[in-house]
């Protein structure tokens, strides 16, 4: 049983599609082991996305992630990392397969509705960034 981190980004929260996105996870065998709605600080957003700090889009990404509330979740299930990435679709919603979260709910490569851990190792680190072990059940 794997765990992965999912973030429903400010654009999707603003569009009020959180429930529809959660339904995609649950109807595809991913269980929500923890969830909370938060407003990221600029400091937290910079720390979370530090791997991208030298990329040209870093400041825009940070500004976007602090533009409104997000929903952070720990998803649990068989091959959770890969399954979540499959459900999300390509980073650019124009390239995302029909029926994926990004194809259905994202507006652009920047406002792309969701974040998901890209590896098991990153999933552990990302989960620990947002959740104490006692919050996950």
UniProtKB/Swiss-Prot annotation:
Enzyme nomenclature, EC number: 2.7.4.6
Essential cofactor(s): Mg(2+)
SUPFAM superfamilies: Nucleoside diphosphate kinase, NDK
Gene Ontology biological-process entries: CTP biosynthetic process; GTP biosynthetic process; UTP biosynthetic process
Enzyme class: transferase
Catalytic reactions of this protein: a 2'-deoxyribonucleoside 5'-diphosphate + ATP = a 2'-deoxyribonucleoside 5'-triphosphate + ADP; a ribonucleoside 5'-diphosphate + ATP = a ribonucleoside 5'-triphosphate + ADP
Binding site for ATP: 9, 57, 85, 91, 102, 112
Keywords per UniProt: ATP-binding, Cytoplasm, Kinase, Magnesium, Metal-binding, Nucleotide metabolism, Nucleotide-binding, Phosphoprotein, Transferase
Compartments in which it is found: Cytoplasm
Record carries keyword Hydrolase: no
GO CC aspect terms: cytoplasm
Active site: 115 (pros-phosphohistidine intermediate)
Subunit structure: Homotetramer.
Protein family (similarity comment): Belongs to the NDK family.
Stated role: Major role in the synthesis of nucleoside triphosphates other than ATP. The ATP gamma phosphate is transferred to the NDP beta phosphate via a ping-pong mechanism, using a phosphorylated active-site intermediate.
Name of this protein: Nucleoside diphosphate kinase
């Amino acid at each position: 049983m794997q765990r992965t981190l999912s973030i429903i980004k400010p654009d999707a929260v603003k569009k009020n599609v959180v429930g529809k996105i959660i339904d995609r996870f649950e109807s595809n065998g991913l269980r929500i082991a923890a969830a909370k709605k938060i407003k990221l600080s600029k400091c937290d957003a910079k720390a979370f996305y530090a791997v991208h700090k030298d990329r040209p889009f870093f400041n825009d990404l940070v500004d976007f992630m602090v533009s409104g509330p997000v929903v952070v979740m720990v998803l649990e299930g068989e091959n959770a990392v890969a399954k979540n990435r499959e459900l999300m679709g390509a980073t650019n919603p124009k390239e995302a397969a029909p029926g994926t979260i990004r194809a259905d709910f994202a507006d652009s490569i920047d406002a792309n509705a969701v974040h998901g851990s890209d590896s098991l190792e990153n999933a552990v680190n990302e989960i620990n960034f947002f959740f104490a072990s006692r919050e996950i059940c």
